[in-house]
Every structure is written in structure tokens, then in C-alpha cells.
Amino acid sequence: MIDVSSQRVNVQRPLDALGNSLNSPVIIKLKGDREFRGVLKSFDLHMNLVLNDAEELEDGEVTRRLGTVLIRGDNIVYISP
């Protein structure tokens, strides 16, 4: 049996983790296997995101440079800091 009372557990809520990633590069995976990379500028409670210097990726390679984009939160599969 593990005694968890002596262990520190660092648990973050999803929006807290996003807040920690503001003004940092992130990779966003969307439904339909689309992937974007850019600097996270803002987000809201629905996890809608604004990325600056956004690029669309395919197999890890840049296919398009998009500039500033808004990504709807419903389409996001994961966000990687």
C-alpha cells in the first residue's frame, strides 16, 4: 500500500495548463488528423485558441504558413506544450 499523505501531487486543471503555455510554442492536434504549431496568444473557457505564427503540419513537416489563426475548441484532440 502506498502512503500518499507524504507525497506531493501536482495536479493542474486543463485551463491552468493552457494559462501556463501562453506566449509559448504549442502543437495542436485536431480531429481529422490535422496538426498545427504556433505561439499560443489566448484562449477561452471553450478552449477556443488563438495562435500567432501558425503553421500547418503534415508528418511533422510544415505544409503551410498561416500567420494568426483561431481554432475552435470542439475540434481539438490534444494540445502539447
UniProtKB/Swiss-Prot annotation:
UniProt keyword annotations, A-Z: Ribonucleoprotein
Q: Which family does it belong to?
A: Belongs to the snRNP Sm proteins family.
Which PROSITE patterns does the record match to this protein?
SM
What GO MF terms are annotated?
Answer: RNA binding
Q: Name one Pfam family in it.
A: LSM
Write down what this protein is called.
Answer: Putative snRNP Sm-like protein
List each copy of the Sm domain by range: 13-81
Source species of the chain: Methanothermobacter thermautotrophicus (strain ATCC 29096 / DSM 1053 / JCM 10044 / NBRC 100330 / Delta H) (Methanobacterium thermoautotrophicum)
